[in-house]
């Protein structure tokens, strides 16, 4: 009982200390009482001044031997061990500690905010007892206790620092809840308004339907009355015709009767005849006098018909004179322009002549390209094929490609470029990478397969990531990096290959992939138009039909460009419109992906048209390349040089130039358009990357 009273006295100050907020005096009292506990409690809980060795004396009995787990022997041993363990009692020291801990926990006041800290205090005291009693393990136990105390202090400090964040989160949660409730109330109000509007519209529709039904009935009634009136009119018309016929017959009968009853002419009165003759003679005399007077008065008068003819002739001559004057003035202006052009041509001729003299004086001799025949693999025959139709600059590129191909073949490994931000994602690797050494044909076929898969892909990912994923799917994860380096080095080298050059431009971000895709769509559309004309499916059409299809498919091309395309397919001065053309061969590609001259000419014209369009845009902006141009000015300039451009294309061009989503382009908000700006040079470079082209003619057709 004395021990119990003493332990109760220990527990009461603990509650008061925790509730007091932890003042220095309270902490000192707590330390003193804790030291008293440490002095008294071990004396009470020990057995004769010595600690109980439990359960150390049972350790020798708990050694496991290699036995079968399910055998009878193992079961018997397990039962005997359980009986022995149940017969062994706990040490008195351990029991007193457990009773003390249980009573201390029952005496705690857990209704306060610091209940968990109060609950931890008895365990801390028990641990202090262990530290004081077990002298051998005191350093280790003290370090464990200190580590836990430091961790608890750190956690408390962290909880205290997170309290403002918790309050802020609660406040934000309340604000968001209020906003959600407000939005829901607003939505409910809008829904009610829409429902009312819907009911009003339904009522209006019912009213209109009733009016429609009444009007239909009225129209039907009017049609019936019109039919009745028409029948009555027909009846009256027939009756009128009958009456007219009867009336004519009666009149003829009356005339016949009057002729039968009329006396002869000679039965007239002679006096009346004499008087009538006299009056007739007077009228004749008066008429002759008037005729003579008119002849005398109109002797010098010109007939009106002749006057009108002369006036008409005079007007025609006057118009011809005005036309000739205008033609003369126009010819005079053209003559002056030709004189100026002649003078400028003379100046250019002199300038070119001087430049020619300077070039002839300073330039080196023209290289003898036939020396390359013995160096290039394949001999003179292959060199003739490579050099056909190429100038010196292009021949240098061909020679560099052949030399580079040989050097590329000699390499067994490529050095890894590392993991820098400037390195493309598909080339980020550290260490040597094996050169797969594919042929040019294999690289071209691989690029074609990549384009096919890219076009068929629904969810678009960045092109470099797609390229590397494609290689992983094709060659596996282990060989994907080696193929990436190999293909990259090949497409970087073979710039004369059309498909490699385009793939390299898209891969390095110099062109958008829409340029290549739209080019293929244009060729497919042209082939479809040619197939529609070839009704017999013979694979050939006339030159005239081909020219007509080119003009309808490319309405914005000039006559000179159409003529260039015609020459690319074999049109010459001696050709006839009836000559047949095998149009299918125009779209063929060789095994290295090289297109026919017709497709190459189309691509060259596309590039030149794009450059001309961007140059016209630059001239129309009339700004320095490093100056900023607003979205408003860019939009107005695009509409000036391309008036027929639709809103979708305009949004796409502005989105590409200013790098904002097409749906976010503020076409209707001029204030926002005046805020968004970018450098002219940057905008033109971005438009040059995309499929930028003229939509319609510069000046729209007035008839359209």
Curated annotation (Swiss-Prot):
Gene Ontology annotations for the cellular component aspect, listed alphabetically: cytoplasm; perinuclear region of cytoplasm
Organism (species): Mus musculus
Principal location listed in the UniProt entry: cytoplasm
Expressing tissues: Specifically expressed in testes. Predominantly detected in the post-meiotic stages of germ cells.
Subunit structure: Interacts with TSNAX.
GO biological process: cell differentiation; spermatogenesis
Pfam families with a match to the protein in the record: TSNAXIP1_N
Keyword tRNA-binding set for record: no
Lipoprotein recorded as keyword: no
Alphabetically ordered keywords of this record: Coiled coil, Cytoplasm, Developmental protein, Differentiation, Spermatogenesis
UniProt feature coiled coil, ranges: 190-230, 304-342
Subcellular location: Cytoplasm, Perinuclear region
Cysteines joined through disulfide linkages: none
Described purpose of this protein according to its UniProt entry: Possible role in spermatogenesis.
Top-rank lineage group of the source organism: Eukaryota
Protein name as annotated: Translin-associated factor X-interacting protein 1
Annotated signal sequence range: none
Region spans: Disordered: 1-37
């Amino acid at each position: 009982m004395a021990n119990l009273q003493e332990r109760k006295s220990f527990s009461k100050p603990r509650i008061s200390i925790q509730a007091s907020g932890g003042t220095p005096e309270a902490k000192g009292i707590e330390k003193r009482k804790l030291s008293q506990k440490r002095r008294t409690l071990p004396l009470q809980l020990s057995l004769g001044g010595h600690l109980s060795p439990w359960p150390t004396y049972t350790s020798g009995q708990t050694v496991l031997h290699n036995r079968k787990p399910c055998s009878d022997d193992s079961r018997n041993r397990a039962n005997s061990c359980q009986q022995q363990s149940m017969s062994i009692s706990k040490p008195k020291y351990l029991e007193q500690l457990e009773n003390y801990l249980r009573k201390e926990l029952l005496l705690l006041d857990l209704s306060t905010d610091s209940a968990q800290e109060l609950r931890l205090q008895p365990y801390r005291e028990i641990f202090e007892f262990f530290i004081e009693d077990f002298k051998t393990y005191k350093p280790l136990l003290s370090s464990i206790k200190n580590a836990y105390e430091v961790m608890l202090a750190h956690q408390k400090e962290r909880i205290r620092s997170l309290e403002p964040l918790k309050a802020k989160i609660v406040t934000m949660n309340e604000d968001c809840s209020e906003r959600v409730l407000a939005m829901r109330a607003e939505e409910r109000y809008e829904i009610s308004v829409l429902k009312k509007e819907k009911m009003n519209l339904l009522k209006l529709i019912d009213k209109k339907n009733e009016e429609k039904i009444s009007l239909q009935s009225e129209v039907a009634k009017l049609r019936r009355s019109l039919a009745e009136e028409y029948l009555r009119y027909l009846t009256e018309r027939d009756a009128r015709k009958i009456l007219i016929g009867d009336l004519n017959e009666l009149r003829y009968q009356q005339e016949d009767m009057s002729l039968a009853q009329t006396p002869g002419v000679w039965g007239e009165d002679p006096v009346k005849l004499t008087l009538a003759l006299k009056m007739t003679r007077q009228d004749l005399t008066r008429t002759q006098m008037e005729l003579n007077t008119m002849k005398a008065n109109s002797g010098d008068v010109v007939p009106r018909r002749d006057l009108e003819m002369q006036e008409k002739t005079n007007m025609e001559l006057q118009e011809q004179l005005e036309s000739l004057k205008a033609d003369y003035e126009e010819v005079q202006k053209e003559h002056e322009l030709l004189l100026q052009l002649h003078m400028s041509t003379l100046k250019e001729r002199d300038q070119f002549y001087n430049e020619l003299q300077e070039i002839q004086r300073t330039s080196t001799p023209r290289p003898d390209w036939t020396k390359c025949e013995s160096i290039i693999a394949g001999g003179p025959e292959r060199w003739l094929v490579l050099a056909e139709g190429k100038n010196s600059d292009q021949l240098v590129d061909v020679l560099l490609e052949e030399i580079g191909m040989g050097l590329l073949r000699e390499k067994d490994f490529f050095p890894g470029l590392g993991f820098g931000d400037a390195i493309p994602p598909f080339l980020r690797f550290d260490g040597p990478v094996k050169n797969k050494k594919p042929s040019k044909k294999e690289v071209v076929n691989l690029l074609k397969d990549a384009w096919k898969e890219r076009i068929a892909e629904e969810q678009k990912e960045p092109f470099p990531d797609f390229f590397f994923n494609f290689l992983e799917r094709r060659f596996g994860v282990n060989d994907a990096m080696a193929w990436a380096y190999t293909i990259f080095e090949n497409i970087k080298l073979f710039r004369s290959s059309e498909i490699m050059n385009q793939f390299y431009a898209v891969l390095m971000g110099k062109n958008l992939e829409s340029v290549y895709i739209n080019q293929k769509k244009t060729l497919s559309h042209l082939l479809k138009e040619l197939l529609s004309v070839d009704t017999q499916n013979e694979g050939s059409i006339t030159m005239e039909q081909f020219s007509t299809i080119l003009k309808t498919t490319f309405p914005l091309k000039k006559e000179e460009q159409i003529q260039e395309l015609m020459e690319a397919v074999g049109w010459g001065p001696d050709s006839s419109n009836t000559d047949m053309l095998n149009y299918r061969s125009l779209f063929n590609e060789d095994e290295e992906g090289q297109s026919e001259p017709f497709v190459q000419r189309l691509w060259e014209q596309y590039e030149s048209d794009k450059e001309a369009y961007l140059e016209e845009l630059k001239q129309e902006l009339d700004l320095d390349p490093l100056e900023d141009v607003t979205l408003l000015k860019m939009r107005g300039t695009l509409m000036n040089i391309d008036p027929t451009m639709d809103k979708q294309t305009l949004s796409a061009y502005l989105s590409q130039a200013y790098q904002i989503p097409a749906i976010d382009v503020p076409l209707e908000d001029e204030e926002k358009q005046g805020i968004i700006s970018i450098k002219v040079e940057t905008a033109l470079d971005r438009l040059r990357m995309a499929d930028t082209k003229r939509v319609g003619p510069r000046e729209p057709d007035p008839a359209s």
